Every structure is written in C-alpha cells, then in structure tokens.
C-alpha cells in the first residue's frame, strides 16, 4: 500500500505512475504522453485486474480496460494492490471476481477542534509544456456531515525530441507530433456519519481531448488521429453495524462513458476516414451481509447486479446489452496465530442484442478461493501466507460483437493462481535502524482459453478466438527500512524486485513455443529513499524495467532494451 505523504514523495502525477513502485506490476502506456494507461498484474492480462474507486469497481464492458491516467494523486488517500483478493470477506460480490485488484481511496475530510474548512491549491509544470493546476476544498457542514470538491486541469504539448535510426544508416533527431493532451477532472463528495456506521455519495466527471502520435513507418513522423472522452459516474455507499453479530454494506452506481475517435484523411492522406462515436451506460447495485457466528468466525453473503449497454454509430452494429448477476459466500476464521478464509463466487451473465444477429449464450460459472496465514512464533512478527484462486473473465462486448471482428462463441478466459510467501518485520529502539520489513512471494499462474485476435482467410480481417495458454512463474520481493541518525535526521527506504518467466504454450508445433510473452521483462524493480532533516525533505525514486521482447518470437529483431527513470525532489 502507498498512502498519505508516501504518495506525494514519489514524484508521481497520476495513479498509473504510482503503481510502478509495486512488485509484479507492468504498466502499459498506449500512445505515449496522452495514451491509455492500464495495468497488468503478474502477467495475467489487463482484463483480469479489477480497479475499485472508493470501494466500487470502475467498469468498461466495451473493452474491459480502465485508463488509470485519469485519476490524480492530488485527491488520493491511498493506493492498495492485492494479489488474488482482499483478506476481508465483508465486501461486494464483485470484489471476489478478479485475479488481482487495485483499490483507490480518495481523501476523506478530517477536521480537528474548531476547523471548518480546508483549501489546498497546487500548480505543477514541467517538460513538454505541462501545465497542471488543481484545487481541493473540504467543508465541515456540521459534526456529522462533510463535503469535498476537487478539480484539476492538465495540458501538455506532448512534443519531445527523440532519435530515429534505420538499418540503412539513416539517423536523425525529430520532434514528436500530435501528442497533445488537455483534460479536466471534477469530483465532489458528501460524507455522513450515522450511529455505528456511515454513508457516502460521490459524483465524478472527466473530459479530455488528445492526439495519438502513432508509430513511425516508412519515415512518416506525424499522425492526425484525435480522441475525445467524457466519463461520468455517481455512486453511493451505506454501511452500518446493526449489532455485534450483523453488519450491512450497500453500494449503488450509475456511469456514462462517451468516446469519439476521428481519423481524417483531409489532414492526413494516409488515413482511412474514421469518425466513430461510442456510448456506454452502466447501472450497478450491491448488498453485502456479514454475520459473526462465534468470536473469530465470520460468514458473509453478498449479491450484486449490473447492467451494461453499448451504442455506436457503426455500420451493422448490434447494440449489445449485458445483465450480470453475482452471488458470493465467504467465511473467515481467526484462531490465535492462524487465519483462514474461503470463498465461492457464482457469476451469471445474459447478453441480448437489438438486431436479428445472434447473441452469446448465457454463462454460469462457480469459482473458489482459499487464503491462509500463520504466525509460527508468538514473539516474532513473522507471517507465512498462501492462497489458491480460480477465477475467469468474460469476453468483453468488443470481443463478442465488434463489427466483422467479434465472435459470439468465445468461452471465458480462466486463471489459476498459486501463491506462497512470508512477511517479517521488526522494530528497534536503541539503534540507528528503527524498523525493517521484508516480504517475499513465490507464485505460479495459469491462463487458459486465452482470448486473442487472429487473421481470417482474409488477412485484412481479423477475428477473436480462444487459443492461448500461458504459464507464469515469478518471485516478488520487497524491503522497507527506517533509520534515525541523531535527533533530527531520519531516513526511510523501500526496494521492490520482481522476476517473472511468463511463457506462451499455445501451440507445441510453433517455432517459438515456450517463449517469453510480449513486453514482459524477466527482471524489474524500483527503489525510493526519503530523507528528513528539521524542516527539509529530499526524495529520490528509481524505476527499472529489464530486457524484453515485443513478440512471442524471442529474436533479435523484437528485442527491447532495458530502461530506467530517476526522480529527485527537495
């Protein structure tokens, strides 16, 4: 978890940047400065990652991805990563439904004594013409009701110099074009306290326009593709402990997403005219119940319903609608130094289309998970943990229904996860080293029925099929330390390292059978150091991504060099 001041020290501007400091994470950045930023946990694929904002999942039924670049850290209280699922069982059914989860918790107003309001303004600027002002206003309406308003604007030209070389000796320095971005984010919230509980309501709006610089092909350096996005949602949460044995958690949400993509041959003769508009709507409701059977033994039952629709102005578009029901039951036992949790999730999906085309058949799946942890020694803070989880992801609406590409006969994509690890921490009171924490995990993951795109008999027309199988073996390691040198100098550090061998075992007759899957490095890691002396503070952070390949063909032509970044702030 990254929270509070630790987030601010990392020189990160959005959630995607901050997530680079976790082990086992790959950030996919499509389109450079203004591109879509998604996250891949332990190489299982972006679609297997659930992203939750204030406890409710962010959805995208069209393509299954969430752009993390549109969530700022200026209004963020914590960013937490879970492999498998949260250790808490009191949660909506959807929280059990991902191979890995990221929880974004926005700031909750906190006031002391006679404080009535807080105001925070920031202005950031930097390379590539970045202008990034923001404001946060928190108001205490009365003792049991607070409000919050956050707004942010970001603009960048996206122009930066780069070197371009070809095999025939051509070598030049060029400036990246059509990488500009302007985006506005506004969100407001109400926070209420009730007896033995709370309620929250939030509204969020994000509006952006950006260019896509594209790849350099045959010495063509500029592109004119443009995209406009509008994302809006409003959501509410109610939680109350009715007694020491029963608690209720309810969530509700409505979301609207609009995307406009334009490729205009009047500006770029190499483009085929494309002027597409997509409209998504989502309605979601959830109720979770927790029962305390005995001290140390809890049981939860939760039920969710979600409705998604997708409209577009494409020829022969089928206008899909999806109804999803989820039921989860879970139990957790805590016996002194031993803890165990088991859950079973039922998922029921029904699709309809508004045309005479065939819709995908109904899907019904039951998927289990088991989590255990044990502290062998009472006086030593050493915890051994492990989990097994089987989960799946439904084909997205694009996978099933995209014009000329979708395939309604697709099966879900399954994952099996096995994890074994430990955490050790110790505090010291009479030495320079004040605390140390070590975490290590060894894991093995399988991805079955992997959904991929493949060309048909007409190479210019592709379709979606179930074909791939991937096996992932990896190690995540993390070290955190705190030092007190003298009375006034403090030093904190964290190091993360990941080793992953993610192999493609789709076709045993393939020349590159068993090769590392695209863009997954064998080695990656990060480091961050924070130094404090009196009222001064210095922060240094480092991110490393090792060598990798751009295709499952692990040959020299597809080789990608390692890269690293360093950030220093005072």
Predicted feature residues:
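Structural signature of Gram-negative outer-membrane beta-barrels, strongest in the C-terminal barrel
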Residues: 294-445, 528-530
